[in-house]
């Protein structure tokens, strides 16, 4: 469990074919953030740098929900991808 802006979140590792990893368009992905359950679902097949990237991406969604940001989903996805790739470098400056 972790908190962002006093909102408690959980991380669950699930089977790569789990319904929990299904996107709204019906495709399966590697990670999903579920606001209603305050849970990040990650494929248990992830490891190493890919796990770090997917988790970082999902944490952006957690922060967006926790701070009640209303960002269009296509923009939020771009921000999440950017931070998952370059966030450590930006923060480390």
What is each model feature region?
Residues 53-65:
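Active-site recognition of the HExxH zinc-binding catalytic motif
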Residues 90-93:
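Short helix/loop segments within enzyme catalytic domains
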């Amino acid at each position: 469990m972790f908190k962002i802006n006093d909102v408690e979140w959980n991380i669950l590792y699930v089977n790569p074919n789990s319904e929990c990893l299904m996107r709204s368009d019906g495709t399966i992905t590697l990670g999903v953030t579920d606001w209603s359950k305050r849970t990040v679902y990650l494929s248990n097949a992830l490891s190493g740098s890919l796990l770090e990237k997917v988790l970082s991406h999902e944490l952006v969604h957690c922060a967006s929900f926790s701070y009640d940001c209303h960002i269009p989903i296509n923009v939020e996805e771009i921000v999440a991808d950017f931070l998952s790739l370059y966030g450590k470098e930006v923060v480390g400056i």
